[in-house]
């Protein structure tokens, strides 16, 4: 039996999920836009699973921002899952991608807009209003990160046509495809900051984002392993393809991934220290708070991903190779707290 607790993060990355109620509000939006079907139990379960991520990624924000985080999660999963399902041919998939890019770049909706397009449009307009004219560069970074994610979906899905990739190529593609960058740029939208805009183009900051994105990717691959293998999608899961490429057994493959995660965490910590030293002295307490809000968000993307994975029915199962993802483990933890 494997344990996700083999993965070690700094203690100050721990979090308590945001207690604010917002999931039902976003669900009503999903119904309004036709993303979900009324009174459909499967849709309700799917919604609760994916939108609940927001409270782990943004544990300290207010209701308005938590809803926006929930809308981002709703958009991610409903748009990406449709393209991943294989129901569209290449021509149709490309059309869907181009339409969604136009939603974000041009701020336009077609008359026959899909549910995910409507969700994306609403989030875009909220970000535009929140940024205003003064923070147009923040808004542009958010739009750019969303369009890059949109454009990554088809190429990443095509990788498996040539068999499992090497981990270096996989990580290079997946760090965009995992969707971490839009989360980070949305966090910048959340703070009404007066920080020097050159901070966000710092090579240290960019590298920190890459480190976090790769770690989030590897954690996601671990927890989704059983589901993807059962769905014949293991070719793009390192825990699976390490076993095929390197003739590892499952525990050895897992240990290799844990070592990779620890490498990128340590690289992140070194870059974060260097990044903080490179900053000009803060002019006021608000500037310092804003920088540390952004750093905490990077930390929470990792620790929140693992915490969410241990309790979501999307991946938890009685036969999971990870003890923390078996219902019996979660029930035992609950009983011990009573």
Swiss-Prot record:
Terpene synthase that converts its substrate farnesyl diphosphate (FPP) into the sesquiterpene protoillud-7-ene. Gene3D superfamilies: Farnesyl Diphosphate Synthase. This is Terpene synthase 1. The gene is TPS1. A motif (NDxxSxxxD/E motif) lies at residues 220-228. It catalyses: (2E,6E)-farnesyl diphosphate = (2S,3R,6S,9S)-(-)-protoillud-7-ene + diphosphate. GO terms for molecular function: metal ion binding; terpene synthase activity. Contains several highly conserved motifs that are important for catalytic activity including the aspartate-rich 'DDxx(x)D/E' motif and the 'NDxxSxxxD/E' motif, both of which are involved in complexing metal ions to coordinate the binding of the isoprenyl diphosphate substrate in the active site. Belongs to the terpene synthase family. A motif (DDxx(x)D/E motif) lies at residues 80-85. The keyword Cytoplasm does not apply. It comes from the Eukaryota. SUPFAM superfamilies: Terpenoid synthases (SSF48576). It comes from Cavenderia fasciculata (Slime mold).
């Amino acid at each position: 039996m494997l344990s996700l607790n083999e993965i070690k993060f700094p203690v100050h990355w721990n979090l308590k999920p945001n207690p604010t109620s917002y999931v039902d509000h976003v669900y009503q939006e999903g119904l309004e836009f036709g993303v979900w079907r009324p009174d459909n139990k499967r849709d309700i379960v799917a919604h609760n699973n994916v939108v609940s991520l927001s409270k782990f990624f943004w544990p300290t924000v207010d209701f308005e921002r938590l809803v926006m985080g929930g809308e981002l999660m709703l958009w991610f999963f409903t748009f990406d899952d449709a393209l991943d399902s294989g129901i569209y041919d290449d021509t149709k998939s490309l059309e869907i991608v181009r339409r969604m890019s136009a939603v974000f770049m041009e701020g336009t909706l077609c008359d026959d807009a899909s549910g995910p397009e409507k969700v994306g449009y609403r989030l875009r307009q909220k970000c535009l209003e929140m940024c205003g004219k003064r923070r147009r560069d923040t808004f542009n970074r958010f739009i750019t990160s969303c369009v890059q994610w949109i454009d990554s979906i088809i190429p990443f899905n095509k990788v498996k046509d040539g068999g499992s990739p090497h981990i270096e190529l996989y990580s290079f593609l997946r760090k965009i495809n995992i969707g971490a960058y839009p989360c980070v740029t949305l966090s910048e939208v959340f703070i009404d900051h007066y920080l020097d805009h050159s901070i966000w183009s710092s090579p240290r900051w960019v590298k920190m984002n890459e480190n976090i994105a790769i770690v989030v990717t590897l954690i996601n691959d671990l927890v989704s392993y059983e589901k993807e293998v059962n769905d014949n999608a293991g070719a793009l899961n390192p825990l699976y393809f390490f076993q095929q490429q390197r003739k590892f057994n499952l525990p050895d493959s897992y240990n290799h991934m844990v070592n990779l995660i620890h490498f990128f965490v340590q690289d992140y910590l070194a870059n974060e220290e260097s990044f903080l030293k490179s900053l000009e002295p803060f002019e006021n307490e608000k500037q310092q708070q804003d920088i540390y809000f952004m750093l905490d968000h990077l930390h929470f993307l990792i620790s929140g991903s693992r915490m969410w994975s241990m309790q979501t029915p999307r991946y938890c199962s009685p036969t999971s190779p990870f003890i923390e993802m078996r219902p019996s483990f979660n029930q035992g933890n609950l009983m011990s707290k009573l």
